[in-house]
Amino acid sequence: MKLLAVRRLFRIQRVVIRYRLDDLLFEQPLLPWWLASLRLLMPWRWLPRKPTELSRGARLRLALQDLGPIFIKFGQLLSTRRDLLPTDIADELMLLQDRVPPFDPQKAVALIEEQLGAKVGEVFSRFDVEPLASASVAQVHAARLKTGEEVVVKVVRPGLKPVIAQDLAWLFLIAKAAERASADARRLHPVEIVGDYEKTIYDELDLLREAANASQLRRNFEGSELMYVPQVYWDLCRPKVLVMERIYGVPVTDMVTLADQRTDMKLLAERGVEVFFTQVFRDSFFHADMHPGNIFVSTVKPWSPQYIAIDCGIVGSLTAEDQDYLARNLIAFFKRDYRRVAQLHIDSGWVPAHTKVNEFEAAIRTVCEPIFEKPLKDISFGQVLMRLFQTARRFNMEVQPQLVLLQKTLLNIEGLGRQLYPDLDLWSTAKPFLERWMRDRYSPKAVFGNIHGQVEQLPHLANMARDLLERLSQPHLNDPQLPERRRQGDRWALRLLGAGLLGGGAVLAAGAAEAASLAAPAAWPAWLMLAAGLYLIVRQ
């Protein structure tokens, strides 16, 4: 194992020298003098090297490609962090392709038989030895079940964990060295990024997780005209083997075939946006790897086109609070209400509470005002989010993994939509959805549902307050004034109830007031909470 690690180190070093990645480090202006002086000790610095016309982004991309699949996937993850990376590097890393030669089909068969506990011929009436596709983590074979259904069988590459562990160790080492060496590198949080990648890559090795994600997504879009997700055959799924329905469709990037079958491209592009917002705001569960290779279009109804999604290894979800703040941020942004955007970032906890709202507002205005020089249809939602995150990053915004996945997915959907239909107006397509979502969120039914949930918690709050006051009075159990102390405790508990109702009513009223501009119903349930809270406080 140690010998393999040393060999890997020499390979990494050779690639670094070949693509002059050492120049990227030593060009840093704030590099400590002792580290900068190490450049003189590197023997290859004194050897003649051919000048390169490649950009720094291209050199980094080619180096990652040379280092193999684990580094390629890491580069793909990096490309989604546009809130951290310079644009030229992020654009180059987007070009990385996760394509590797297939492994021995007999090893795939052996692994399937080991996982299923049965011979391939006992499970499938046909199994194609030649793989349909091959990537760094797994490869896919076509097959037919004994019952006649056409399926695909996804198999994890054998012996992958030791390779991943070794490459991750080197990535962590490089990240830690970069953090110590450069202030700019520290701002990018490389160790944190490698940590995120470690979780992602190990999650992708568990195909049961992917199967569960696919089942959830299929259930969410059951009977929908927007998107179809293939069926998972759970009886044949194991940690290293996934069996699911084989789909037949047109790759979403095959414009010629889509045009030949007279697909409604405008509707297809708009439905892509609707799929995104449905996943994010209705389901709070979204496919986070919607690049063109994972998206197909059904051939059944070209006049009412339906997407087909595969490969659900990476998904994201948002809390109700994240959904709410995201919707309000988008609405406030398109109203050019930058103070509201700044305040929402602070209220949500995305930036520290001590952030000066005026300074944050000014920074957002400086970055975002130029965007509105374009027509609304030319404004990129993904770019808006990216610029907001970049600005917030300067004010110590904490990394929100779910928002990073969201931004990546939105950029994919948006790019795809405009490729299908260049005149796609994302805001006009999204606005009705956001209006409907805000209206439903603050409808009387939804508000009463929230009140019901809060009311269920009120007895617990009262009991907790009373118990606390009784514990505080324990040293005085023989005190003749104990009954009066208990009555005081009850009054304090009711005051706390009143304060809770008052606060909850204020929050609901504020939300409903904001939704009112989007044609939401009146917020009278919130006023009931405010009145009840005020009554309890005054009465006690």
UniProtKB/Swiss-Prot annotation:
HAMAP family: UbiB
Keywords: ATP-binding, Cell inner membrane, Cell membrane, Kinase, Membrane, Nucleotide-binding, Transferase, Transmembrane, Transmembrane helix, Ubiquinone biosynthesis
Keyword Membrane set for record: yes
Protein task: Is probably a protein kinase regulator of UbiI activity which is involved in aerobic coenzyme Q (ubiquinone) biosynthesis.
Intracellular or extracellular location(s): Cell inner membrane
Recorded superkingdom: Bacteria
Amino acids binding ATP: 132-140, 154
Catalytic-site annotation from UniProt: 289
Single GO BP term: ubiquinone biosynthetic process
Name of the protein this chain belongs to: Probable protein kinase UbiB
UniProt main location, coarse: membrane
Matching CDD domains: UbiB (cd13972)
Membrane topology: Multi-pass membrane protein
EC top class, as a word: transferase
EC assignment: 2.7.-.-
Family designation: Belongs to the ABC1 family. UbiB subfamily.
Protein kinase domain boundaries: 126-494
PANTHER family registered for this protein in UniProt: CHAPERONE-ACTIVITY OF BC1 COMPLEX CABC1 -RELATED, PROTEIN ACTIVITY OF BC1 COMPLEX KINASE 7, CHLOROPLASTIC
Transmembrane segments: 24-44, 496-516, 518-538
GO cellular component: plasma membrane
Pathway: Cofactor biosynthesis; ubiquinone biosynthesis [regulation]
Molecular function (Gene Ontology), one example: protein kinase activity
Protein's organism: Pseudomonas putida (strain GB-1)
